[in-house]
């Protein structure tokens, strides 16, 4: 690709490649091409870029508030809970998909009670996607949030994305439901729309 677009969500393409600019301060691209072209591209970029592992890519997604829903959390959330409409992950203007009526109703009636937030966790027990969050006032069978993605940043320290009840995220009483942990809600790199 001769020239890559730098605008978030923009697409650059030629006959051999398609590259999509991913959100975040550090420029990242998802590149789609054949294996043959991927090998050539890798060699041409090796002196201009720094290779990292997929875990670092996951960390950058967490840092940029971009959730990745996997088998631990699928079918747990409507798109708005994962902030999808805020990161161009869902459109209310077009498309047809399973559950669209519920998603649109939630959007247009403004009854959103949960959102995705970045959090910092300090815990001796490693947290994982799908773990539940609670508050000090939660009963044994209640939970106020679910971990979506987790990345270990240091010994016993983690950054994560979690879908959390808006009221619970505004309190200072979050905890992992099944482990002793200190949890701090961090700021998203994009604004949440009016939380009705």
Put a short name on every predicted segment.
Residues 82-90, 104-196:
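Glycine-rich, small/acidic residue-mixed loop/short-helix segments
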Residues 34, 70, 165-167:
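Helix N-cap / beta->alpha transition motif
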Residues 53-54, 59-85:
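Short, conserved active-site entrance elements at the starts or edges of catalytic domains
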Residues 1-64:
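Acidic, low-complexity central loop/insert segments
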Residues 1-13, 67-76, 193-196:
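Short, low-order "capping/linker" segments at domain edges
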Residues 38, 59, 66-69, 109-111, ...:
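Short, catalytically relevant binding-site loops at active-site mouths
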Residues 11, 22, 65, 95, ...:
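Residue-level recognition of beta-strand microenvironments
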